Amino acid sequence: MKVLFVASECAPFVKTGGLADVIGAVPKALAPLGVEARVMLPLYPALRVLSEGGKTVWSSDNLHGGAARLLDVRAEGLDLLLLDAPHLFDRGGNIYLDADGTDWPDNPLRFGALSWVAADIAANGAAGWQPEIVHAHDWQAGLVPAYLHQMDAPKPPCVLTIHNIAFQGLFSPDLMAPLGLDAALYTQDGMEFYGNLGFLKAGLAFADKITTVSPTYAREIMQPEFGMGLEGLLRARARDVSGILNGIDTDVWNPETDPALPKSYSLKGLKAKQQSRQAVLERFGLTPPDNAPLFCVISRLTTQKGVDVLLDVVPDLVARGAGLAVLGSGDRDLEAAFVAAAHRFPGAVGVIIGYDEDLSHLMQGGSDAILIPSRFEPCGLTQLYGLRYGTIPVVARTGGLADTIIDANEAALAATCATGVQFAPVTPDALSHAIDRCCDLFAERKTWSGMMRCAMRHPVGWETSSKAYLEVYDRLLGG
């Protein structure tokens, strides 16, 4: 089976969030199941080195104002189709934002181009390769199903995966014609969204199947609280919607082989985790006592992630003698508030604004628990990394967090299957209580050790989820 993945980012080449990790991992997980996958993404400056020796399999003299070509490249175990359109993608800043943190004004043309080329390849093939399934991801590839829908030629079915419904790609309807979209598609049942052209809505309206990244999130987004205005469309298409949990790349995230850790460790020998703990303490300038847990946060600093609620309970956490290491960036006000907390509680709270992949690995290896107080979380990956490294997740009971973490209640502790601490609602009182529970569990060393071992045994790879994706593909092909 041949499958074309279409996305705006892919690890390890270019990454701004969990989407990249998924796109970098799923094709590899599907390969043993007989799926021949290729990943189409833009050729950003960071990927330019990959283009050397790439084979041109498609070209155009004018793709939204400039020449473009599609390069067939193999790198890091992935078959890539890189859209080389320098006028659209060869620029500094973030892949979505300029140096000032503002959306590139031509983002609809940039990702509309990606979607159009993907649809063209889906319908017509390239260099003898043509997909049987197209799998588009998030709003950046949301127009792929729409372009396929308006084609008269035979074309493969399309799956759209929602990684975060909060990001919808809303633009002026004046772009319909420049994007080559049929005006008849701009309806309430199509891609119109409160007077805007909705890229994600277009995908939801015209994809043959819709998936999202956890069963709980699939149910949540059909309700007004989480659906961001798209809940009605999703309820109407409920039979076509399924939730498939994300996994992680267990080769990349492996405490037995992770080069970012000062010393590897495993279920057979957890003592070496203490060396990573000491390294984290030194990096963040922390001095909590050995009998108190070291909490970490590795997150975008936004209200969606609930870190504003965490700020309210930092004094309670410090009063318990615990330490807190924070790595992340996001809203400037929240960044400043965390830096202020570090100044207020020296030795107890350490903050590094930004993102560092190696440091995130070290923090997973060296922390005792990871705090994830998200108001909503489609799936979440950091809690899965925590499980893999025996770093106990303390999570809000929502989305994929609810699906992947077994709360340390009396029944779960008695059955020796607890892997973390859940709490709800996302309020300072509930989070403070969850932190208290975690500290109490940490004090019971035998109980804590058992939770660590349960966490590390918990399956977090792609084996089950890749089979679920294959089932979706098979159903579309009549299998």
Curated annotation (Swiss-Prot):
Catalytic activity: [(1->4)-alpha-D-glucosyl](n) + ADP-alpha-D-glucose = [(1->4)-alpha-D-glucosyl](n+1) + ADP + H(+)
Entries under SUPFAM superfamilies matching the protein: UDP-Glycosyltransferase/glycogen phosphorylase
Organism field: Roseobacter denitrificans (strain ATCC 33942 / OCh 114)
One Gene Ontology MF term: alpha-1,4-glucan glucosyltransferase (ADP-glucose donor) activity
Summary of the function given for this chain in its UniProt record: Synthesizes alpha-1,4-glucan chains using ADP-glucose.
Keyword terms: Glycogen biosynthesis, Glycosyltransferase, Transferase
UniProt-listed Enzyme Commission number(s): 2.4.1.21
GO CC annotation terms, alphabetical: cytosol
Pathway: Glycan biosynthesis; glycogen biosynthesis
Name of the protein in question: Glycogen synthase
Gene: glgA
